[in-house]
Regions:
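Outer-membrane pore/translocation modules
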Residues: 1-78
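Outer membrane beta-barrel transmembrane domains
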Residues: 61-80, 85-169
Length: 169
């Protein structure tokens, strides 16, 4: 029934704002990529900024809030010794106003199945962990097949909120 009172009334004004972001990424490899093995060394270095113009956040009401600029950087490296296994250390950092996040971790990756005579699919198993500064420890596992992956991650609270959460993520 379109005449039922629902209590949700909004001015149907169109609101838009301009937001400027920019970033760049550099990828390197010690050798040409190959479907059957990990590169001996490779990595990615990235950095980006969001909300460069530090505009106003538009809401359904007339209230507006300043948006702080966000800086993000990440470093990902892959080191494969026997080329059937690799260690991938990584770091992620983000800064917005006075809030920050710094997370560092690593994953061990193993080839389970390489391409065979008639296909170029590969299966990779990964297990790893990370630590987010003053906040949480993380564990994760992942299985990749061809261009698909499925994984599970869990966080254990290490911050001052540990008492309330009993350490669970």
């Amino acid at each position: 029934d379109p005449n039922i009172q629902h209590g949700e009334y909004f001015d149907r004004q169109q609101k838009a704002s301009f937001d400027l972001s920019a970033g760049m990424s550099y990828k390197f490899m010690s050798e040409a990529p190959n479907i059957d093995r990990f590169s001996k060394t490779s990595g990615t270095i990235s950095a980006g900024f969001w909300h460069l113009n530090q505009g106003k956040r538009l809401t359904l009401s007339d209230e507006q809030a300043d948006i702080k600029m966000v800086f993000m950087t990440d470093l990902l490296f892959a080191m494969g010794q026997d080329k059937k296994a690799a260690f991938n250390p990584w770091v992620l950092g983000m800064l917005q106003g006075s809030a920050y996040e710094l997370t560092a971790g690593g994953d061990f990756r193993f080839f389970l199945k390489q391409s065979d005579k008639y296909s170029v699919s590969r299966a990779i198993f990964s297990i790893g962990g990370a630590y987010r500064l003053n906040d949480a420890a993380m564990a994760r596992i992942m299985f990749d097949y061809a261009n698909y992956g499925i994984g599970v991650a869990y966080e254990m609270n290490t911050s001052s909120l540990k008492e309330a959460s009993k350490g669970f993520g």
